[in-house]
Amino acid sequence: SPHGEMLFSISLEHKFKTYIIMQQNQTSSKAYLIRIVMVAVLGGLLFGYDTAVISGAEKGLQAFFMGATDFTYTDFWHGFTSSSALIGCIIGSALSGVLASNWGRKRTLIFAGVMFFVSAWGSMCPETMVLPEGKPNLTLLIVFNIYRVIGGVGVGLASAVCPMYIGEIAPSNIRGMLVSWNQFAIIFGQLVVYFVNFFILGDHIAPAIQSIGNGMNEILNGGEAAWAIETGWRYMFGSEMVPAGLFAVLICFVPETPRYLAMVGQDDKALHVLTRINGDLEAENILSEIKNTVTEKT
């Protein structure tokens, strides 16, 4: 009958509109999630960037401090300076769990971003507020290494909290894939900084350093490599300020993880984040699972 056909048509139209709305919501949720994860994996990129930047800068840095008059820059000092960031990595990784639990995942990552930025700036200009520029000495070397340790703290925090953040905010069906993006970002960060160092050096000559025994070395081409010795290594370390500043700013605009929000009793905020990512139907069920898990562990 005409009446039955009309009802069927209305029902079909309603189902079609509902389907379109659901598809739009899913697309919006995926885009929102991808934006969040892309910001978070910048922490992984900085992990790789900070640990690999020394590879291009170490010869210029070594030649620079070999010009010091108040101490001898031996192989010991060179090895310590090249690896001092690892001290910060140990500190950062040891503190990551405490900070993530007390400050939250988001604020801990903001702090890591600030550490990366301060380290990049201080490693580029370690003389700032301490010594006259361009005068290599033991105090300047110590200050430089302090800044590298600060960057290492950022690495230690990012290495633990970035995958934690992604794992807690991603839906279970794609969680493994999204967490793996962080691992890719670490390697990509190392690759990027190799090219950055290459382009910074450009047509300039890198210093050639030869061992003369007993932990001592000499520069074979100091005049030709003057730019790399005085300036090049500074630009290499300073280049990290770009991704570090970007990370520190953008991470302020992503949400805290639903798990942490549930841990501190902010269920409404947790439900809002879950709804944006998973939709209305799944959000309440996921929140209930999170709360049950949190309750069991506490």
Go through each PLM region and give its residues:
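Short, Lys/Arg-enriched N-terminal segments with co-localized hydrophobic residues
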Residues: 1-21
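Transmembrane-helix signature of 12-pass secondary carriers
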Residues: 18-298
